Amino acid sequence: MTSQSPALLVLQHIACEPPAAYEDELLAWGARVHRVELDQGEPLPDWRAFAGIVAMGGPMGAYDDERLPWLAAEKQLIADAVRAGTPYWGVCLGAQLLAASLGGEVFTGAEPEVGLLPVLTTAEAAGDPVFALAPGRFSALQWHADTYALPPGAVQLARSAVYEQQAFAVGAAYGLQFHLEVPVWLAEQWAEVPAYAHSLQTLMGPDGLCRLIEQVRAYELETTRLARALFAAWLEHVVGLRVPDGKPPPERPRSVPGA
C-alpha cells in the first residue's frame, strides 16, 4: 500500500451485494479496493496491510459458523483489526458481524424488516464525526430478520420503529443495519436471484419485487447521496484519507419522509 494510493479491504459475502455507492465514493477518493469474495472460498489477507475494512451484507447469519466455517475466521479478523484501531464500515450482515466480533449477541428478531422505511438518528449521532451529517429522519432500504445487542463500549447512532438497533459505532468501527448504497440497477439484480426473489414475494406479496424496485427507484437519489456523504466523512475523519484536490464538500442531506 502506498501513501498515494491507499487500499481498503472489502469483505463481500455474495456477488450481488457489492459496496455499490460506497465503492463509487472510494474510487472518487483515489483509493484502491482489495475485494475478497468469502462465499467463493477466497482467503482472508493480512488486515494490517489496509487503511480500513468495508464488510457488506449477505443472506447468511453472523452465527452460521457450522454451516460456513469461514465466518469464524472473518469474525476473528474483524475483532483483531477493530481492537487494534483499524477503521471499519459494516453494512447489514457486516454490522451484525461487527457486533458479534466484539461480544454483542446476534439473533433472529420478532419480525422481518423489509422495504424503504424511516430511520431515526439518536441524540448521540449529533456529536459523531460521521453521523452528524445525517438528518434526524431519513429513508433507507431494509432487508433483514436478524438483529443484534450492542457490544460493550458501543454508541447507538440510529433506530427504527421495528428495531431499536440500526447503527452504532465503537471507536473507528461503524455498523449500519440498513442499506443506503443500493441503486436501482442493483435492486433489479437482486430480483434476478431466485432465492432473493422468493424471499421478497414471501415477505411482501406477489408484487413484492416490483414494489421494492419502485421504492428504490423513487428514493435512489436521496439514499445514495446520503450513503456517499456519510462514507466520505468516514474516509476523511476516521480513516484519515486526504480529500482529493477539487472534490466538492459533501452536500448535507435533508430529512425526507419515510416510504
Predicted regions mapped to residue ranges:
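N-terminal beta1-alpha1 cap of cysteine-dependent amidohydrolase-like domains
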Residues: 1-84, 201-259
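Pocket-forming structural segment of enzyme catalytic cores
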Residues: 102-186
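C-terminal helical/coil "lid" or tail adjacent to the Rossmann-like core of SAM-dependent
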Residues: 180-216
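Short active-site oxyanion
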Residues: 7, 85-87, 155, 172
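Glycine-rich, phosphate-binding/catalytic loops in enzymes
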Residues: 25-28, 69-73, 106-107, 158-159, ...
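Short glycine-/acidic-enriched loop or helix-start segments at secondary-structure transitions
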Residues: 19-21, 45, 64-66, 98-101, ...
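Cysteine-nucleophile active-site neighborhood
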Residues: 55-125
